[in-house]
Regions:
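A short, N-terminal "cap"/entry segment at the start of jelly-roll beta-barrel domains
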Residues: 2-56, 89, 104-105, 113, ...
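Extracytoplasmic
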Residues: 52-57, 73, 93, 109, ...
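A short beta-loop-beta micro-motif enriched in histidine and acidic residues
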Residues: 53, 65-80
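Histidine-centered metal-chelating micro-motifs
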Residues: 67-69, 87, 104, 108-117
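Structural recognition of the beta-strand scaffold that forms the well-ordered cores
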Residues: 70, 78-80, 103-106, 128-130
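Ligand-binding loop in jelly-roll beta-barrel domains
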Residues: 95, 110-137
């Protein structure tokens, strides 16, 4: 059996510290990159008086600092802030900050360039009604 000298122990301890630091840094970087929205569909209902049209009711939860990718909605969007505050920018309009109790409307097929939690420390939540064609997705990424 080989005896490890004190200098070898010190080198191993130092190497383990660097490995641990690298692991923590990687986890923190992944957490920052993956902070996105969480969409939950509550209801999807066809409209009897509008053939082929559906209303989708959903919530969008934003963790602190969360950001949605730029996207487009196929139909009309009606959004209401249930909790926190959200920054939204559609097409060439100025970014707007909407707080709890406020609502807004988005025209169909307009690029939604910014949609994010305005806070780095508090969550935010939206209630959204989307009126669209039955076959369309809730949102599509901007290419």
């Amino acid at each position: 059996m080989r005896t490890i000298t004190c200098s070898a122990c010190a080198m191993m301890k130092q190497a383990l510290k660097w490995i641990a630091l690298a692991g923590v840094t990687l986890v923190m970087a992944q957490a920052t990159v993956s902070a996105e929205d969480k969409v939950s569909v509550l209801m999807k209902q066809g409209l009897a008086d509008m053939a082929g049209k559906v209303v989708t009711v959903l919530t969008v939860d934003y963790a602190p600092g969360a950001v949605s990718d730029a996207h487009v909605h196929p139909g009309s969007v009606f959004a209401y802030v249930l909790e926190g505050s959200v920054v939204s920018q559609v097409e060439d309009e100025e970014p707007m900050t909407h707080t709890k109790g406020q609502s807004w409307y988005e025209l169909p097929k307009k690029p939604h360039l910014v949609s994010k939690n305005a806070s780095q420390t508090e969550p935010a939540k939206l209630l959204v009604f989307l009126l669209s064609q039955e076959s369309e997705l809730i949102k599509a990424p901007i290419k």
